[in-house]
């Protein structure tokens, strides 16, 4: 009688170069989509140092690549933009706006694509922690008498989110610098919850937690995400 043996197949881990190529594509997409939301797939592949054909080993379509980039970015922002807890809900709201700005100001076009583009509904899950934090902050502010109570909390929270996104739109269209965007997003959300412009200005000016963070010190250049074989070779100049 023949003996039949079965061997359980263990899925192979992805090759290191395949994983590196995928990350290179993602990084290239972030850079180029932040300049032009309609950038073609060929340009993204070239930026990553890959052929268009090789892209299809990772993403079946350009839309799939954009979707992956968008959802990953939204998941990061949904967690990273949460500020430290503050007792005063008004200061908390301003800090939330400032923290969100700091997370997206360097990728403004891509951030707009994330929250206003065709994937807005899909990224809702990734942004849920951020929106829940916003709603709770507004609820506390209304309960404490620090924010307007003539609008339902859920509606007011959505209006606050809209005010912050309007600042993002304006900052992108006019290329506002980081400090101005930081200031405007706080003033916009504070105005939406009922603070007068003078009160909001003084709060932002005198609250240390709301100050613009100092620029980071010199950082080493980022690693080139392209495969080593595709990187340009730099030939040293001959000595004089």
Describe the residue ranges of each PLM region.
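Basic, helix-initiating cap at the start of DNA-binding domains
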Residues: 1-47, 63-67
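C-terminal peripheral helix-coil segments that are non-catalytic and often amphipathic
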Residues: 2-9, 136-143, 169, 173-240
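Short hydrophobic clusters on alpha-helical segments that form packing/core surfaces
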Residues: 25-32, 73, 100, 104
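Short, hydrophobic secondary-structure boundary micro-motifs
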Residues: 41-42, 110-115, 146, 150, ...
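Short hydrophobic/aromatic patch on the recognition helix
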Residues: 49-59
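Alpha-helical DNA-contacting segments of helix-turn-helix folds
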Residues: 59, 63-73
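Hydrophobic alpha-helical connector segments
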Residues: 68, 79-109, 115-122, 182
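Amphipathic alpha-helical packing segments from all-alpha helical-bundle domains
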Residues: 95, 119-169
């Amino acid at each position: 009688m023949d003996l039949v043996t079965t061997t359980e197949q263990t899925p192979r881990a992805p090759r290191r170069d395949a994983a590196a190529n995928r990350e290179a594509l993602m990084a290239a997409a972030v850079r180029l989509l932040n300049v032009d939301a309609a950038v073609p797939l060929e340009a993204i592949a070239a930026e990553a140092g890959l052929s268009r054909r090789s892209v299809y080993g990772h993403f079946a379509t350009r839309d799939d690549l954009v979707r992956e980039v968008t959802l990953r970015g939204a998941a990061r922002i949904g967690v990273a933009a949460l500020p430290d807890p503050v007792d005063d809900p008004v200061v908390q709201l301003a800090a939330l706006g400032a923290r969100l700005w700091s997370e997206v100001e360097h990728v403004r076009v891509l951030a707009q694509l994330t929250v206003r583009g065709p994937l807005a509904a899909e990224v809702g899950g990734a942004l849920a922690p951020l929106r829940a934090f916003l709603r709770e902050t507004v609820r506390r502010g209304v309960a404490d008498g620090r924010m307007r109570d003539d609008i339902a909390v859920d509606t007011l929270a959505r209006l606050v989110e809209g005010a912050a996104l309007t600042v993002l739109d304006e900052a992108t269209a006019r290329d506002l610098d980081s400090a101005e965007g930081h200031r405007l997003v706080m003033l916009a959300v504070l105005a939406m919850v009922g603070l007068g412009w003078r009160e909001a200005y003084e709060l932002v000016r005198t609250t240390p937690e709301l100050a613009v963070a100092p620029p980071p010190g010199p950082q080493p250049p980022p690693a080139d995400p392209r495969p080593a074989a595709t990187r340009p070779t730099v030939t040293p100049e001959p000595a004089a």
